[in-house]
Amino acid sequence: YGKRRHPKKLTPLAYKQFIPNVAEKTLGASGRYEGKITRNSERFKELTPNYNPDIIFKDEENTVMNQWPGVKLRVTEGWDEDGHHLEESLHYKGRAVDITTSDRDKSKYGTLSRLAVEAGF
């Protein structure tokens, strides 16, 4: 005990690269489609809120910090009910998230994607 693991080198994801390398709505990536979760459904209560102060949530209804000091993770879309996605979108189930960084530097997106994969998203 007491041994510190060396951090592994993170390889940025390429634009439009998926982990696993299949489309997000396939059975292997996201499981069986179980229907849209609406605000009034019982399953809505199963969604877990995230109150992490290091994440800026875009308010459409009115681990990044360690990689880029002073930069925060910006969630632009998570669970959604507005109907702007495809019928079986994972956003309606609370199983998809769109993210950027607070500085909106697109050169960081590949590494940001890799960090999300490493975090289990």
Swiss-Prot record:
Residues reported to bind Ca(2+) 1: 60-61, 76-77
Keywords: Autocatalytic cleavage, Calcium, Cell membrane, Developmental protein, Hydrolase, Lipoprotein, Membrane, Metal-binding, Palmitate, Protease, Secreted, Zinc
InterPro entries per the UniProt record, alphabetical: Hedgehog, Hedgehog_sig/DD-Pept_Zn-bd_sf, Hedgehog_Signaling, Hedgehog_signalling_dom
Post-translational modification as stated in the protein's UniProt record: The C-terminal domain displays an autoproteolysis activity and a cholesterol transferase activity. Both activities result in the cleavage of the full-length protein and covalent attachment of a cholesterol moiety to the C-terminal of the newly generated N-terminal fragment (N-product). The N-product is the active species in both local and long-range signaling, whereas the C-product has no signaling activity. Cholesterylation is required for N-product targeting to lipid rafts and multimerization.
GO CC terms, sorted: extracellular space; plasma membrane
Binding, Zn(2+): 91, 98
Binding site for Ca(2+) 2: 61, 77, 80, 82
A GO MF label: patched binding
Domain of life, source organism: Eukaryota
Main location: secreted
GO aspect biological process, one term: proteolysis
Compartments reported by the entry: Secreted; Cell membrane
UniProt remark on domains: The sonic hedgehog protein N-product binds calcium and zinc ions; this stabilizes the protein fold and is essential for protein-protein interactions mediated by this domain.
Role noted for this protein: Intercellular signal essential for a variety of patterning events during development. Signal produced by the notochord that induces somite patterning, dorso-ventral patterning of the brain and early patterning of the developing eyes. Displays floor plate-inducing activity. Binds to the patched (PTC) receptor, which functions in association with smoothened (SMO), to activate the transcription of target genes. In the absence of SHH, PTC represses the constitutive signaling activity of SMO.
Subunit architecture: N-product is active as a multimer.
Protein name, per record: Sonic hedgehog protein
Organism annotation: Trigonostigma heteromorpha (Harlequin rasbora)
Lineage of producing organism: Eukaryota, Metazoa, Chordata, Craniata, Vertebrata
